[in-house]
Amino acid sequence: MSEFLRIAMAQFDFPVGAVAQNAERIIALIEQARDEHGADVVMFPELALSGYPPEDLLLRPGFLAHCQVAIERIAAATHGIVAVVGWPQSAGSVVYNVASVLCDGQVEQTYRKRELPNYAVFDERRYFEVDPNGSRCVFKVKGVPVGVLICEDLWFSEPLADTVCGGAELVLVPNASPYERGKHAQRDALLAERARETGAAIAYLNVVGGQDALVFDGASVVVDGHGRVHPAAAAFSDQWLVVDYMRSERRFVPLQWVAESEVSINALVWRAVVRGVQDYCRKNGFSKVWVGLSGGIDSALVLAIAVDALGADQVTAVRLPSRYTAELSNDLAAEQCHSLGVRLETVAIEPVFEGLLAALGPLFAGMAPDATEENLQSRSRGVILMALANKFGGLLLTTGNKSEYAVGYATIYGDMCGGYAPLKDIYKSQVFELAQWRNTVSDVLAIPPGVIHRPPSAELRAQQTDQDSLPPYEVLDGILSLYVDQEQSREDIIAAGYAAGVVDYVLNLVKINEWKRHQAAPGPKVSQRAFGRERRYPISNAYRG
């Protein structure tokens, strides 16, 4: 019986729908794990073959058939090593989320996921079934009994306990667990608890990469049979993680493992957003992006994110001044572009704005200017930016933040124009925090201090500031965090110390702007409750509370 078992954990990105390419890569990685790392077992993330989440691709018989052919091809290419590969298995009229054990050219066993998450961003019960006969997978490698579970199974005590009862002392857990603030500490605590409950050693592998609004952070870990969690692998990093499992002590010895100890929340959020932009562009065929740069904090932060994601040479900033644009705004935009090495173009919106006013003048005769004229300026900018992206290629990044999306402080078909919204799940107060943090991690100031310290303004009328229409952001974001992220009631929010009139004003804005959010571009989820697939409120909604 061997003293140790070498495990190679493939913390890589496997794009959704790219079945043939993923299969080729999995085969190549299996060979690399065997030949270069000397691994006895190689494991891949949850649904690595199809990518996660495949969503309604799982309703297409042809897609499932393609996955079946691909897993057989991977199995046929697997020799001299055991591979654990996640994929969607069709069995008659039902589909299972499975991990198959491949060895010696064939599928040896297949484990079917037992706990299907159906909350927040997850809707696995829409697609998958649980095997009514139950599922347990335990196999031996070099005399070591190894079990398999999948992601959500570990959040319940019974699946791991059952696997250990089946003889497993080491359990491999492939995952597709998206990032959100505080997730790392939550995962580590859970893993330690499960290991202590059962005495099992756990190899927890998470996928990495951006998929539309989800960003998977990797941060894979191993936990010994005493509940000790080894420092997590670098978050948002594509890498091999190779460990030796020492059977006599039920512990792991890392051989190839780029670990991280303490990483700040701001650093993790930054990496998540950068990876979200990077992968959204790469997976949708965009090599460059456009950013409308106003001299304000939101667009400045988006520009810095874009540069970190794609490089300065793939980013073009555009100033779009109007009669209300302060000279300081133009200067700060130019300062940032010079500092980051970004090309800056300037297109004045006055001719477009004046043309719209002239065209609408006869219909608007006798009516006082209001938000309509302000929105015309924003929509003039949207038309110009979309035209540039259309003519020269590239993706327009929109610059709104979560506070603005929540209360509708954004112009539909104006500053909401764009294909991806990097700040969509980041409140305005967090925007300032991230900007200040980003300036501490490099010699070059990514965001001019003048941008950070000036009062926020849409500059759509003279002497305008955001606080003309909204409570101070620390108040607004506090209310929104309780209402949106924590689903607290009006009464609970007032009891937390916020004035009833302000609470009513903010909650009404959230309600009446649902229609705008339904038309907003996707953006990376970094909070426990992001707008989009995990907050599905009706647009036509009479409930208030």
Curated annotation (Swiss-Prot):
Annotated ranges, domain CN hydrolase: 5-247
SUPFAM superfamilies: Adenine nucleotide alpha hydrolases-like, Carbon-nitrogen hydrolase
UniProt-recorded Gene Ontology molecular function terms: ATP binding; glutaminase activity; NAD+ synthase (glutamine-hydrolyzing) activity; NAD+ synthase activity; nitrilase activity
Swiss-Prot/TrEMBL keywords: ATP-binding, Ligase, NAD, Nucleotide-binding
Highest taxon listed in the record's lineage: Bacteria
Active site location: E46 (proton acceptor), K113 (for glutaminase activity), C151 (nucleophile)
Cross-referenced InterPro entries: C-N_Hydrolase, C-N_Hydrolase_sf, Gln-dep_NAD_synthase, NAD/GMP_synthase, NAD_synthase, Nitrilase/CN_hydratase_CS, Rossmann-like_a/b/a_fold
Catalytic EC class: ligase
Gene3D superfamilies: Carbon-nitrogen hydrolase (3.60.110.10), HUPs (3.40.50.620)
Binding site for deamido-NAD(+): N375, E404, K516
CDD domains membership: GAT_Gln-NAD-synth, NAD_synthase
Region (Ligase): 269-545
GO terms for biological process, alphabetical: NAD biosynthetic process
Enzyme Commission designation: 6.3.5.1
Chain positions recorded as L-glutamine binding sites: Y119, S177, K183
A Gene Ontology cellular-component term: cytoplasm
Annotated pathway: Cofactor biosynthesis; NAD(+) biosynthesis; NAD(+) from deamido-NAD(+) (L-Gln route): step 1/1
Family: In the C-terminal section; belongs to the NAD synthetase family.
Protein name, as recorded: Glutamine-dependent NAD(+) synthetase
Gene source species: Xylella fastidiosa (strain 9a5c)
